[in-house]
């Protein structure tokens, strides 16, 4: 007695007989190709047969794209397509011979065309998503460590496949298409990306939506941040949330346990130019937070993050020297500190010392840190730089910084940065030391305030001497 036929596949309630012979053969091959020795001994004729099945099955998908009512009849074809992709995916694992054989059959072009048809269907059945994912995995595997395959994948996939997949609602499709992009990109192709900035922006969005996904993160940190031309072209086109995401990853790169290399420094000098010039031009958007009108938190947060990047950049000796002489940066920072300090005194707003801290991550907390980081940046820019020390004096920045030294619940870290800034402003600078000593004598800076920031004034005869009570910190 013959064995009973297996139940037919089901899609959208319609019963469709499964093509048993081809499907079982493909599943057997897929299992065999999990072993390296089987991959290495596979004859090329097998891949031609798999490709023939793939092409034949793709006709049903093409028909469904032309006639949406045919989507219900795709079950058997999708089973075969999925197993073809799984078989080819496994065959390519660490086997350049198979990668080359499969590529030379023009399988890559067939796969990309089929994946684009999947996206065109706009159907989210699990069977279709599975075929979609397996197709992308195959493209990732055939391109892995194989420059010839990477070139062919790029020719067929760029830009349409990435534009179709990087913003897909399925996170696995986003991850697999990001893997293909990371694997295929090189220096020359980065230039092509500059002409298709929507793809780069989609990668930023993908990381924003799926921060746990490794591939968008690697594309940004290992590729985008090594291309100042791409970052400069892309940055003006990013919305505020996307800017914050990119700047956060830039901070992560700068503050990583692995310091910037010699090759990184010229690139990050270009980034420093972009960040500093953007901050100088746009920093006053933060003042909107002090207005009575509902502020644009996202715009202000993007500006605040620019300051955070500048603070971290000025910890690096090579980047510090460039930013210390950046035109208008120090002046703008002092001017902005003065404006928000006055705004905080005149009315009760987000910059007021009496403001209370709300939930973690609230914009008010970020704004309070903004004043601290302005003072921190002033201190960094004045580190062992007499020209900047004198410039702060000329701009009446020293009394301004001291006046900010009022500990409050809203800004518990402000005092430590005032201490740091005053130390850097007075190091080997007798003029600035004399100014602070005279301020204390005239009652413009009380002794308790100076003691709080680590100084005391001592009178020797007719001369006032500012003495430090703490060790000099580094930036």
UniProtKB/Swiss-Prot annotation:
Keywords: Cell cycle, Cell division, Cell projection, Ciliopathy, Cytoplasm, Cytoskeleton, Methylation, Neurodegeneration, Phosphoprotein, Spinocerebellar ataxia, Ubl conjugation. InterPro entries: ARM-like, ARM-type_fold, Ataxin-10/CTR86_families, Ataxin-10_domain. The modification Phosphothreonine is found at residue 82. Polyubiquitinated. Phosphorylation at Ser-12 by AURKB promotes the association of ATXN10 with PLK1. Phosphorylation at Ser-77 and Thr-82 by PLK1 may play a role in the regulation of cytokinesis and may stimulate the proteasome-mediated degradation of ATXN10. It is found in: Cytoplasm, Perinuclear region; Midbody; Cytoplasm, Cytoskeleton, Cilium basal body; Cytoplasm, Cytoskeleton, Microtubule organizing center, Centrosome, Centriole. One of its GO terms (cellular component) is cilium. Expressed in the central nervous system. The modification Omega-N-methylarginine is found at residue 10. The modification Phosphoserine is found at residues 12, 77, 430. SUPFAM superfamilies: ARM repeat. GO terms for biological process: cell division; cilium assembly; nervous system development; neuron projection development; regulation of cytokinesis. Its main location: cytoplasm. It holds the Pfam family Atx10homo_assoc. Homooligomer. Interacts with GNB2. Interacts with IQCB1. Interacts with OGT. It is linked to Spinocerebellar ataxia 10: Spinocerebellar ataxia is a clinically and genetically heterogeneous group of cerebellar disorders. Patients show progressive incoordination of gait and often poor coordination of hands, speech and eye movements, due to degeneration of the cerebellum with variable involvement of the brainstem and spinal cord. SCA10 is an autosomal dominant cerebellar ataxia (ADCA). Defects in ATXN1 may be a cause of nephronophthisis a chronic tubulo-interstitial nephropathy that leads to anemia, polyuria, polydipsia, isosthenuria and death in uremia. May play a role in the regulation of cytokinesis. May play a role in signaling by stimulating protein glycosylation. Induces neuritogenesis by activating the Ras-MAP kinase pathway and is necessary for the survival of cerebellar neurons. Does not appear to play a major role in ciliogenesis. Belongs to the ataxin-10 family. This is Ataxin-10.
């Amino acid at each position: 007695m013959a064995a009973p036929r297996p139940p037919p596949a089901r899609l959208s309630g319609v019963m469709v007989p499964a093509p048993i012979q081809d499907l079982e053969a493909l599943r057997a091959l897929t299992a065999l190709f999990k072993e390296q020795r089987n991959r290495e001994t596979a004859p090329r004729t097998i891949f031609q047969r798999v490709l023939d099945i793939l092409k034949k099955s793709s006709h049903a998908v093409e028909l469904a794209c032309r006639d949406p009512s045919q989507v219900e009849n795709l079950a058997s074809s999708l089973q075969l397509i999925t197993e073809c992709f799984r078989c080819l995916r496994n065959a390519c694992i660490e086997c350049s011979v198979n990668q080359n054989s499969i590529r030379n059959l023009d399988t890559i072009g067939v796969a990309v065309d089929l994946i684009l048809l999947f996206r065109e269907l706009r159907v989210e059945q699990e069977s279709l998503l599975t075929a979609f994912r397996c197709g992308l995995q195959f493209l990732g595997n055939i391109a892995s460590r194989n420059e010839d395959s990477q070139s062919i994948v790029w020719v067929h996939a760029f830009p349409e496949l990435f534009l179709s997949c990087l913003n897909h609602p399925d996170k696995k499709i986003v991850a697999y298409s990001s893997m293909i992009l990371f694997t295929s990109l090189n220096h020359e192709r980065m230039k092509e990306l500059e002409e298709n900035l929507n793809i780069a922006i989609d990668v930023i969005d993908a990381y924003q939506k799926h921060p746990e996904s490794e591939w968008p993160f690697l594309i940004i940190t290992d590729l985008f941040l090594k291309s100042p031309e791409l970052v400069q072209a892309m940055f003006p086109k990013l919305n505020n949330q996307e800017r914050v995401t990119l700047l956060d990853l830039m901070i992560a790169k700068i503050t990583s346990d692995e310091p910037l290399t010699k090759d990184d420094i010229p690139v990050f000098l270009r980034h420093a130019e972009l960040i500093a010039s953007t901050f100088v031009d746009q920093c006053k958007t933060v003042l909107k937070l002090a207005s009575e009108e509902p502020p644009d938190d996202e715009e202000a947060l993007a500006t605040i993050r620019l300051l955070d990047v500048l603070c971290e950049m000025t910890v690096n000796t090579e980047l510090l020297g460039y930013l210390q002489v950046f035109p208008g940066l120090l002046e703008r920072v002092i001017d902005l500190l003065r404006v928000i300090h006055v705004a905080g005194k005149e009315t009760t707003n987000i910059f007021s010392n009496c403001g209370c801290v709300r939930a973690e991550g609230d914009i008010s907390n970020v704004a309070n840190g903004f004043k601290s980081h302005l003072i921190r940046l002033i201190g960094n820019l004045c580190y062992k730089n007499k020209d900047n020390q004198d410039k702060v004096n000329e701009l009446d920045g020293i009394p301004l910084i001291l006046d900010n030294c009022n500990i409050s619940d809203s800004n518990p870290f402000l005092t430590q940065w005032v201490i740091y800034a005053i130390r850097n402003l007075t190091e080997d600078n007798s003029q600035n030391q004399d100014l602070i000593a005279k301020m204390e004598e005239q009652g413009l800076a009380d002794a308790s305030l100076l003691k709080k920031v680590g100084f005391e004034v001592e009178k020797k005869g007719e001369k006032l001497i500012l003495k430090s009570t703490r060790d000099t910190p580094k930036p």
